[in-house]
């Protein structure tokens, strides 16, 4: 039986009548925008913003990008402003 969770992973093996549990904790990586030399979140930087937008044009959630909540809000606002100013497209076209 295999159970997995976002923060930890539990593996259960059946050995005879007893079950043995092994718990593996994956260390969560920190926010890529909170490190020392991180780029500044700005609507005028579409190269940075496009990394946090999916192929369909939707903003990626923080559980996928590992961005902290504070930076995720700043990213969302910057992406919205960049779209309004036509620096980023609202919908990406399939090629």
Curated annotation (Swiss-Prot):
UniProt record similarity statement: Belongs to the bacterial ribosomal protein bS18 family.
Example of a GO cellular component annotation carried by this entry: cytosolic small ribosomal subunit
GO MF term set: small ribosomal subunit rRNA binding; structural constituent of ribosome
Protein's name according to its UniProt entry: Small ribosomal subunit protein bS18
Gene3D superfamilies recorded: Ribosomal protein S18
Gene (UniProt): rpsR
Signal sequence bounds: none
Pfam families (alphabetical): Ribosomal_S18
Subunit and interaction comment: Part of the 30S ribosomal subunit. Forms a tight heterodimer with protein bS6.
UniProt entry keywords in alphabetical sequence: Ribonucleoprotein, Ribosomal protein, RNA-binding, rRNA-binding
Function: Binds as a heterodimer with protein bS6 to the central domain of the 16S rRNA, where it helps stabilize the platform of the 30S subunit.
Gene Ontology biological process: translation
InterPro entries, alphabetized: Ribosomal_bS18 (IPR001648), Ribosomal_bS18_CS (IPR018275), Ribosomal_bS18_sf (IPR036870)
PROSITE patterns documented for this protein: RIBOSOMAL_S18
